[in-house]
Amino acid sequence: MAKTLMAVDAGTGSVRAVLFSLEGEQLGCVQQEWTHKEDPRYPGSMDFDWVHNWDLARSCIRGVIEQTGVNPREIAAVSTTCMREGIVLYDQQGQEIWACANVDARSDDEVAQLVHMNPELEKEIYRESGQTYALGALPRLFWVKNKMPQVYEKTAMCTMFNDWLIYKMTGVFSSEPSNACTTGIFNLEKRDWDDRIAASIGLKTGIFPKISECGTVVAHVDAKG
């Protein structure tokens, strides 16, 4: 019988797993700090170590189950949240190939390029998504294209960190509007990605996951996850 709910949060400075009763009472929480390493080649960069950090996330999930003594079979649902604006890129096989935290600031030159290419684009992005260039995915994807073309060419999918958690637990790529819009490549009114924005500056289209509204069951946790 389903008795509890789990939330997993990939925050800026830490990851945590929290268990709640069906009435919303917090039953337990386990948290692990993580650090984002600067690539010495690129000032302002903050790389995300997906291998180590997934180990930390898993340890939090196991830890809160042990802390509370809850039977995993009695967890009715798992939801994910995360730091805004951080992104993960994947290749055609679904393997992570590049990721940066939300505090990454390496794409200053790309912001200047975007302004030069189209002085009105940032205003248009803000009208549609509520996002500006600051911390958004658009300049970062442009940076990867300019500075790491071999990674860019392999990129087949781009997700936010709450989407990454879902993918690691289920093998399914999915996203939701409240965080997808922080990419700046999203139309909040239509509740979907705006490929037109990406195409207007020569970026790939079709590399973002299917959108589902918050609260939608998008997949089931598998044994691998």
What are the functions of these language-model segments?
Residues 59-225:
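Glycine-rich phosphate-binding/catalytic subdomain of phosphoryl-transfer
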